[in-house]
Amino acid sequence: MKKIFIFLILTVFFACLKIIPLDWLQCCYVTTSKYSITKSRRLPSIADNMGISDADFLAETISKSVRFNPIQSKCKFHLNLGQTFITQNVTNFKNMSRKTQMVSHIVDYFLWTNQSSCQISHYFGGLLVSSAAGIVSMDGQKAICLDPIVAPRPYRCIVYSFGINYEWSFDDAMDLYGCKVFSFDPSMNVSNHRRNEKTIFYQMALNDVDKNEWKNNIGIPSRTLSSIYNMLEPIHGQNVIIDYLKIDIESAEWIVLPQILKSGMLDKVRQLSVETHMDFNEDVEMCCEQAKIIHLLEDYGMIRFDSKPNIYSAINLPQRKSLGFEAYEIAWYNYRVSHVDS
């Protein structure tokens, strides 16, 4: 009798594993990522989150591509292994409108933290600020994964920081950590200068093309990431890795991120932080396209380890019947650019 009971339990267990994609992913296109699932660095943490002790068994179970899409819309996400669990708490899709489904899916995707992919994560910088509504929180801090295989190495690290707005807490924190910091902001009324021994400021914009103007301001240059990297090679050396790339450029991220991907510059970036900005009430289809850009980063191999909403971007989302956020701070590390000697 005991053996029969154990057999039944195991049968149910394996049956549940086989239906995980259909049960949890009711509104997505789901396929494995371009790199092998069996070699994914995220697999052990994902298996642990699911209560599965054998990560190889999990890989074998979901190694085949699964496509399931009851929503006939233009918003079809092509998600990889790490993102297959983001919609597990979203239900009643059949009773929602297409716009509702899109908004809920996008919000869940951006809220997904995947924090288990980094054992030691720490925030650098940030100031305590309060809103007109009396909400008090930290703002300006950036998450950095300090796991030895991807952590910036003190006194041997390089940081590119785009978007300062006179708030230097992150840049100063990375300076204290021991990194060479290159700070950029075209909107500040400050010319190029050396802020201290390890930090240099440039009145320059990050763009998808090289121009000698920024928003019709002649004389303030706009440059691609690859052009900026080439400009700085005499200072930080050739073929070096950017240990941390911070991008906080008020919606211009949607212009520069595709160009960075296309240029191959992510091969030179170890960790990336982007503050994303969307407008759900204005154009949901555009938000969907923006979410696809984030997925392209992750399909390339950027491993998300932190995501938090900017509480000052909170809005009422009638489609979701709850508060939502239009700005998110997301951080990734690049598993392709790990410390090989760690």
What is the role of each PLM region?
Residues 2-342:
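Phosphate/nucleotide-binding beta-alpha loop and adjacent structural elements of enzyme active sites
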